[in-house]
């Protein structure tokens, strides 16, 4: 990893709060967004009312609020005058049969991007169990369902979704950039990894046929986009923003032919008098100030213009792995809510309550892994103490990410940037990088950014990365 890439990582970590843009992008609590939008023109409802290191440091656990122990499970009443929607994204599920949980697998987790793939099975099961008590109208999985598009991972996750629907909750899915034609699909065995079978776009739709595609009101012939009715008053516009033909790419794009289909769906929603809620994997707005090319849908202004012309108030996405929320333009324009990765601490999902008058509220809910572990009589200390383990693990992963880049840098590549740093300076810089990145992923950079950016280590980032 080059110094340039590391500097981008650092700015990404700080970017949640250091690049605030207008005030709309940074609510007082980035994990919760509430707004009301009542437009009298289009989008009229029909209802009655209106986020191998050589020498890692000890991670410092963050405060992640645990759920009350021993709390009796109570099921919420179904929402009246609107829809309650659970948003899960970037699960990055890996079939249990594809790993022996050995050395190569553990290294992938500890030197990765923050996903706790070593507990993805338990996190997924716990999340599905927990949301049942919310009585949601639907669970939306907005892409990156699998680690790297392994066919076995898709099939195993689909079996779990079958059980969710048997329990009475509808599930709809769209692909993410990791899910289709991914050359990185692999299994893990000891110190090595081997190529695993991936899936094509047609195979993806077949595997998840029961989770949106078979029940679609309309399917786009040019992509895996479709519409899905949530009762008589609301319709989901599930947009395939991924590029996987002829090869898989990270960035997002809506095909030209798909825009014609989108126009038809906007017109039909208006004619039918239903609220249209668009969902995609990639971001509609420039949520990331560093990774615009990889995160924001290419030429997204075309999609923004179409949606705003029809007064569509809200867009939902994932991909960023970071909890974020912003509005296009300061006092008007579409809102976007980006839900963070389920498998990345704080391991949370979004709960959207969208009322018939087109007002909506959104909050994140942490998966209570400790309660789940006790209920299932787990003896795994990490699960039983997940609220301590998870933030510490995340900090260690981000520390490794930073330290590895500096450790591996060479003078001819970096031009003296890192090679002249002392061991202690590298450690200090990695510590502050880990602190900022971990907070940012949970949508809580605002809690630590003021203190972190006054440290000597942060000033070293400024001196050595941005001279």
Where do the protein language model's features map onto the residues?
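Acidic/histidine-rich helix-loop elements
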Residues: 92-123, 187-192, 245-256, 287-290, ...
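N-terminal active-site segment of His-dependent metallophosphoesterases
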Residues: 54-151
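Active-site-proximal beta-strand elements of phosphoester/diester hydrolases
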Residues: 82-95, 233-244, 279, 335-340, ...
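Active-site environment of divalent metal-dependent phosphoester hydrolases
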Residues: 94-97, 147-149, 177-185, 244-247, ...
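His/acidic metal-ligating clusters that form di-metal
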Residues: 131-138, 170, 235-237, 249-335, ...
């Amino acid at each position: 990893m080059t110094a340039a890439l590391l500097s981008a990582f650092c700015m990404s970590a700080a970017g949640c709060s250091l690049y605030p843009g207008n005030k709309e992008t940074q609510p007082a609590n980035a994990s919760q967004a509430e707004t009301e939008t009542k437009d009298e023109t289009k989008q009229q409802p029909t209802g009655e009312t209106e986020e191998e290191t050589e020498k890692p440091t000890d991670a410092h656990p963050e405060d992640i609020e645990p759920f009350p122990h021993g709390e009796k499970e109570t099921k919420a009443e179904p929402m009246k005058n609107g829809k309650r929607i659970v948003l899960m994204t970037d699960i990055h599920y890996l079939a249990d049969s594809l790993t022996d949980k050995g050395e190569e697998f553990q290294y992938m987790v500890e030197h990765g991007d923050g996903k706790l793939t070593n507990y993805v099975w338990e996190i997924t099961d716990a999340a599905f169990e927990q949301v049942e008590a919310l009585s949601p109208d639907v669970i939306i999985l907005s892409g990156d369902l699998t680690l790297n598009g392994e066919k076995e991972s898709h099939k195993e996750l689909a079996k779990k979704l079958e059980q969710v629907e048997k329990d009475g909750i509808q599930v709809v899915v769209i692909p993410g950039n990791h899910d289709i034609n991914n050359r990185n699909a692999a299994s893990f065995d000891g110190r090595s990894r081997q190529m695993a079978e991936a899936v094509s776009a047609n195979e993806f739709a077949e595997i998840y046929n029961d989770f949106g595609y078979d029940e679609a009101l309309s399917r786009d012939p040019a992509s895996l986009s479709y519409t899905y009715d949530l009762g008589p008053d609301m319709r989901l516009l599930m947009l395939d923003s991924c590029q996987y033909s002829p090869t898989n790419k990270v960035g997002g794009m809506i095909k030209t032919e798909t825009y014609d289909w989108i126009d038809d769906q906007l017109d039909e929603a208006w004619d039918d008098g239903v609220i249209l809620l668009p969902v995609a994997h990639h971001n509609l707005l420039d949520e990331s100030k560093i990774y615009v090319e990889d995160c924001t849908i290419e030429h997204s202004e075309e999609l923004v213009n179409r949606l705003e012309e029809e007064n569509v108030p809200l867009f939902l996405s994932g991909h960023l792995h970071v909890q974020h929320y912003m509005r296009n333009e300061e006092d008007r324009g579409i809102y976007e809510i980006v839900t963070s990765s389920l498998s990345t601490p704080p391991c949370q999902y979004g709960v959207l309550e969208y009322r018939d008058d087109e007002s909506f509220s959104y909050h994140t809910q942490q998966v209570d892994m400790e309660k789940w572990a006790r209920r299932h009589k787990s003896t795994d200390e990490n699960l039983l103490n997940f609220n301590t383990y998870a933030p510490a693990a995340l900090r260690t992963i981000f520390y490794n990410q930073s330290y590895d880049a500096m450790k591996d840098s060479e003078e001819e590549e970096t031009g003296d940037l890192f090679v002249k740093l002392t061991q202690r300076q590298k450690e200090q810089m990695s510590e502050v990088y880990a602190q900022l990145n971990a907070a940012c992923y949970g949508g809580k950079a605002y809690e630590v950014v003021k203190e972190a950016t006054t440290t000597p280590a942060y000033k070293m980032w400024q001196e050595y990365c941005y001279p």
